[in-house]
Swiss-Prot record:
It holds the Pfam family DUF2340. It comes from Bos taurus. Coiled coil: none annotated. Belongs to the UPF0538 family. This is UPF0538 protein C2orf76 homolog. The lineage of its organism: Eukaryota, Metazoa, Chordata, Craniata, Vertebrata.
Length: 126
């Protein structure tokens, strides 16, 4: 079976408290690659994107979580849902397809430490 190439939106989350995020669209993403390989690709690609402001290009992203899948319901959370971590956080050793990624899925890329701190105390600054 040939590998499937899809379009994925990656939401770069710089700050949960300030709701500071920037979406980046990736076309031709191979679903048979591992989550770890995709994270490595993102860490190499993001600093090279001149369209992103420096705070987004130079941030310490390390974790992926599904925000929204095509044709499914969306959450009311403005930045990222704090629910269903066991189902929506992507495990590095699985493939993107096995993790539930399909065409037009939106995933968040963020610092896991920031996420844990925000989840423990979910207060927005504005």
């Amino acid at each position: 079976m040939a590998s499937e190439d899809v379009t994925i939106t990656v939401r770069l989350i710089r700050s949960f408290e300030h709701r500071n995020f920037r979406p980046v669209v990736y076309h031709g993403v191979h679903l048979d690659q591992t989550v770890k390989d995709f994270i490595v690709f993102l860490k190499q690609d993001i600093p090279l994107r001149a369209s992103l402001p420096p705070p987004f290009r130079n941030y310490k992203y390390d974790k992926l979580k599904i925000v929204h899948q095509a044709h499914k319901s969306k959450t009311n959370e403005l930045v990222l849902s704090l629910e269903d971590d066991d189902r929506l956080l992507l495990k590095e050793d699985s493939t993107l397809k096995a993790a539930g990624i399909a065409s037009e899925t939106e995933i968040a890329f963020f610092c896991e430490e920031d996420y844990k701190n925000y989840k423990a105390n979910p207060i927005s600054s504005w």
